[in-house]
Amino acid sequence: MRFKGLDLNLLVALDALMTKRSVTAAARSINLSQPAMSAAIARLRTYFGDDLFTMRGRELIPTPRAIALAPAVRDALLHIQFSIISWDMFNPVQSERRFRIRLSDVMMLVFFERVVKRLAREAPGIGFELLPLTEDPDELLRYGDVDFVILPELFASSDHPKAKLLDDTLVCVGCPTNKQLKRQLSFENYGSMGHIAAKFGRTLKPSIENWLLLEHGLKRRIEVVVPGFSLIPPLLSGTDRIATMPLRLVEHFAKTTPLRVAELPLALPPFAQAVQWPSLHNRDQASIWMRQVLLQEALHMTAPRDSVEYRP
């Protein structure tokens, strides 16, 4: 089908090439033969008057023109998908929809476990692909590579809808044998003790606790860096190191792991965890239903603090 001289099928090919960066992989992803994909590239080059891609080894490298076209092409295809193709009534009981969700290990353990258990009973055909927060949320949402991103609201994109799920707060934790945590921590003690910290992604981006601590002038001597908060408690055992962690996760580990919990030398404000979805998914029936499930489960979460033993 042509629209003003452009074969619209070529947009599907261009999107696949930008995503896969390989002629073979792109052809396979949209059920084309490799010769057919090569022909599509030739036609795209003719229409746009640009090479669009060059080869570096086996990888396709997009030209500036291809990079500029990519977001508009992806937006157009997603708009067609969610406003025309997918506009069927969604029945969660019968659906086999698989939701792709990016979230931290914290929310995986303290929140999403509830969602998975509930839907195993109520909508057993629903599946999930749960992935770590390793990339820029803006990019993930813009290209529709995820159905949802669950992250601290401070880091949410301003270009896509969001909804608050729950509040959390930060506390200091250590091994029960850590004598320095038997008394109120001073700024000096907190800064001089060895810390274990979480950083995320390939570039080890600072986590929420690092952002809040720096924002309020609290500095740490970080001795160990791990790629997620859930790896911290076992590494505290038998050491005098401490860590700053979300209280809900501390509550989760306190059921099985001995921890000494202390107040930070400066009371930090609570922070919110939020869910975001691509703006083009806003009217998608499956997305709407899943949002409702997430918000309902968040409402059932009790406020943190009551179940953790603060040991003097």
From Swiss-Prot:
InterPro entries named in the record: LysR-type_TF, LysR_subst-bd, NodD_PBP2, Tscrpt_reg_HTH_LysR, WH-like_DNA-bd_sf, WH_DNA-bd_sf
DNA-binding region (UniProt annotation): 23-42
GO molecular function, one term: DNA-binding transcription factor activity
Residue ranges of domain HTH lysR-type in the record: 6-63
Pfam families linked to this entry: HTH_1, LysR_substrate
This protein's UniProt keywords: DNA-binding, Nodulation, Plasmid, Repressor, Transcription, Transcription regulation
Transmembrane feature ranges: none
Induction: By flavonoids.
Family recorded in the similarity comment: Belongs to the LysR transcriptional regulatory family.
Job description of the protein: Represses the expression of the nodABCIJ-nolO-noeI operon.
Protein name: Nodulation protein D 2
Organism of this sequence: Sinorhizobium fredii (strain NBRC 101917 / NGR234)
Gene that specifies this protein: nodD2
